[in-house]
Amino acid sequence: MSVTRRSFLRAGTAVAGAALFPSAGPSAQSPLTAADVVQRIKDRVGIPWRAQTVDNVVAGAPETRVRGIATTMMATLDVIQRAAKAGRNLVITHEPTFFSHQDTTEPFAQDAAYQFKTAFMREHDMVVFRFHDHWHAMRPDGIAFGMARELGWEKNRVADSQREFTFDGVPLSKLADQIRDRLGARTVRVVGDPALPVNRVAASWGYYTFSATNLVMARPEVDLFVVGETREWETVEYVQDMIASGRKKALIVIGHVASEQAGMKYCAEWLKGFVSEVPIEFVAASEPFWTPRG
């Protein structure tokens, strides 16, 4: 078949145009990496990124191609396995992956549990990014926002406070039941008179130091302090002594996982606002405790 000069020139022009203007389809896009996602997070937290922080890639390689993202409160092996099964190879966790706040791994180099966990992550090309300090430091605090929403307490929030709420004399037992049911917490513990009318609640999601707790509980208007976890020989004893001395006070200990879980559920929604290339989902960390029947 003969080729005319005109058709030859037309074909040449098409080839040149394709070279100058490559397809804008997915094949022309650079793969989304874990480092890309982390950079987008840094660009959108709305605060300067701290030089000293636990918010780092703690497992895997930053240049790993991301196939899907899972947010979670704690990157336990169970969470990592479920994320891998769902095809989510970037796990964004609020709490540590390696058993200490700093995610220090050296003490566990020869530990069987650590080795099993890291081997699984390597096998499934997984990356874990810790997102703790800046998620709390944002305004609003991502954990506090998610928890208030999950509990249905947005309307009770005190103006200019992310962690204080007002109620109309709700009995302590009723409020404790509400917290247990709405958070799906199995092991909520309560200190105080079940009939105590609660008008003002102060909350600390996660762990709270006694040096901060006692300043809050000492305020006359605060009836109830809600916390994820605390030391029994500090905050718990202090509240018991306040009650024994005639003060109308109460304490609810939810458990660390249940007390921050909804904040990382919200994190998945937040990420979808600027990461659209891959699926994103929240993977709940299982509550570790159970209570034997009496």
Residue positions per predicted region:
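Hydrophobic structural segments
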Residues: 2-294
